[in-house]
């Protein structure tokens, strides 16, 4: 199958390598390459992997993504547009309603920043597809081949919330682990010994629970901005909960010992 990928950051590059591994022809477009958006017009599916950075108010800035979708609409792209970029819940449905000449779905990724391509090919736990169209769902399942262990058919809103659920829960675990690390330090207990004992209860894995002097709070491109985006969304929804704000505030106390991407 001939696929397009717009945006060759960590996510776009991982998608490119992964789909080439499956055997597809991949046509990339990125502002750093000598390419144009017209290059993807004859592809069956185009994956949008452009940045959705944090806005000044903490919300998710979808400006770049919206401009790409608008351009594809103006060019009458006839393939499936699969949004990989993280977006606020409701965005995909808004794009579907706005650009009725396009076929748009949301396909979140759950890749770790430091090993995204490896995860796409060898650690692809879940393929979640947010669409109302069963044909689109089946087409996305087909293009991923045998890489995903599980597939899930969701609505666009559900898939968007799932992406934030994944990242914010990761941030919550990191912050909880760091707080308990401080408790252990004050009580002259070995945090790793306690953490490893807890893992043996079978109630959790040790993912995101490792803490040591050189590995503290979360960093990277995703967890900080996504945590603040959900905090901003809570305000928009008039939900008065402090948990997410507290996660971000407490993480700032540990951030100085984090290498970029280590906790992604």
Enumerate the predicted regions with their spans.
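NAD(P)+-binding Rossmann beta1-loop-alpha1 motif at the extreme N-terminus of oxidoreductases
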Residues: 1-42
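Glycine-rich, N-terminal phosphate-binding loop of Rossmann-like dinucleotide-binding domains
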Residues: 48-51, 85, 131
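ATP-dependent carboxylate/acyl-activation modules
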Residues: 232-236, 249-264
């Amino acid at each position: 199958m001939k696929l397009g990928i717009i945006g060759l950051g960590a996510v776009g590059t991982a998608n490119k390598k992964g789909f080439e591994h499956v055997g597809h022809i991949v046509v990339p477009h990125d502002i750093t390459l000598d390419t144009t958006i017209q290059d993807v017009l004859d592809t069956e599916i185009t994956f949008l992997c452009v940045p959705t950075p944090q806005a000044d108010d903490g919300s998710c800035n979808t400006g770049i993504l919206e401009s790409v979708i608008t351009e594809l609409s103006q060019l009458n792209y006839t393939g499936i547009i699969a949004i990989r970029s993280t977006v606020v819940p409701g965005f995909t449905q808004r794009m579907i309603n706005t650009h009725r000449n396009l076929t748009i779905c949301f396909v979140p990724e759950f890749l770790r920043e430091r090993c995204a391509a490896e995860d796409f090919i060898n650690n692809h736990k879940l393929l979640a597809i947010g669409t109302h169209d069963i044909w689109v769902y089946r087409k996305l399942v087909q293009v991923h081949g045998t890489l995903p262990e599980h597939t899930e058919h969701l609505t666009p809103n559900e898939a968007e919330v799932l992406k934030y659920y994944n990242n914010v829960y990761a941030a919550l675990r990191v912050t909880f682990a760091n707080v308990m690390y401080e408790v252990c330090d004050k009580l002259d207990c070995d945090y790793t010994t306690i953490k490893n004992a807890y893992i043996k209860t079978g109630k959790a894995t040790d993912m995101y629970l490792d803490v040591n002097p050189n590995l503290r709070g979360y960093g990277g491109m995703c967890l900080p901005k996504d945590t603040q985006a959900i905090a901003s969304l809570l305000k928009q929804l008039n939900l008065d909960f402090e948990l997410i704000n507290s996660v971000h505030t407490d993480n700032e106390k540990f951030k100085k010992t984090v290498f970029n991407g280590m906790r992604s």
